[in-house]
Amino acid sequence: MWYPLAAMKGVLEALHQGDYDTAIDLLTRKALFGREREAKEAWLLLAEVYALYGEEGLEKAHHALEEAYALGGLEYDPLYRSLLAELLALEGRPEREVLPLFLPSRDPRVRYHQAQALFYLGRLEEALEALEAGLPPHLAWRAEGLKGRILERLGRHGEAALAYERGAELALGLERYWLLLDAAAMWLEAGEGERALLALKEAEAAVGEEDPEDAATRHYLLARAHLLLGNPGLALEEIRKALALEEESGHKAYGTPLVEGQALLQLGRYEEAMASFREALARADAGERPHVLHEMGVAAMDQGAYPEAEEHLRALVREEGYPYLAQAYADLAEALYRQGRYQEAEAAAREAVARGAVAAGELVLGHVAYDLLHLEEALEHYRKAAESAEEGSREWVGAQEMVVDTLAQLGYRFPEEMVRRGQAVLPYLHPADEWHAALTAYVERAQALLREGKRLN
């Protein structure tokens, strides 16, 4: 553990309280007028403080490090070298310039700055391993925040939420508030709506009067939590508070009207939802537009507005950088299939399969073949869709239904398979679903054939 000079304790307290102006003023005086040891420590701590500002603090952080180095004895000092490594990594310098600065150390403060450097270099697992307990308070909560960001990037959303919450326990005031908002966002990504609501309740209690932009974010997250929990009415109330606060702050995010549209869709208000999506599209930048277009395409398809869905999805598949382009092609294939445009649907579905959306693409290919009475081909596609889909997913349920149905159309071929697949999918269907009755009848007929010892071809 790092034990600061007694003279630095007041500085560390100011830093923990978030009073950076006071801390910087005290450190500057110690750096300029203190004895050599105290001045050197002050310059290093000043560099650390300026590094907390990210790119904005780079110039002043470098200056502080240069002043510390000029006092001598720091060429092989692990703390000095880890701070320099962090600054160079933040500037975008290559690994070959950054990593040689690392010296072995168990000092948590040194390890923290090495972790920051590794994070900036994109070496996320190594950054996670570098962090150690025992940091001074102004870094302890930041270390948990850094863990949260690393875990978030690694897609480990539940763990990221826990890290942000641990950071919030150590932080004060606005820093605590922001970490709780981060935790709530990660709980939402993890599908934990109730835990998101708890974090947001704590966040509200952590500050007095909220900045309008921060308050808009909190209401946006509340809306998403209520949507996740199946409360679209409450979600709509919260998202409209967020929209009003965005008007006040002047910061208009595309995600706010997007969530409004999602809430309206769940309430069955399609036209209003599409108006919200159009507002989201108007606010979106180039990287955000595809997400809105996909939302609009799927919403139109669910409404049965297939030409409109096609329009949005065709615009979407022109967005080559979109990470869900394979699913976009599968959705376009479905929109074309629903319009009876089989050749175009087949081409889009094959593109979806080639790009990785195997289950969704094969399902559409099966539908096209089935409608054209190419039942053997349809069966092959449906089996592939069922094998590649996640159990319980929309594609898996649809594929299992259609394998059983197609086998029935083929004269109850492979009754054992019909029974196995039918019994697997029935628990996922509501008894009122027409497919529940149809599959039950198919399964009972196949079981009867098996009892009779028949294998019809």
Q: What are the roles of these predicted feature ranges?
A:
Residues 5, 41, 76-79, 109, ...:
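Start-of-helix register in tetratricopeptide repeats
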Residues 23, 61, 97-98, 127, ...:
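Single-residue signature of alpha-solenoid repeat helices
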Residues 6-29, 33, 51-52, 109, ...:
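Alpha-helical segment of the N-proximal tetratricopeptide repeat
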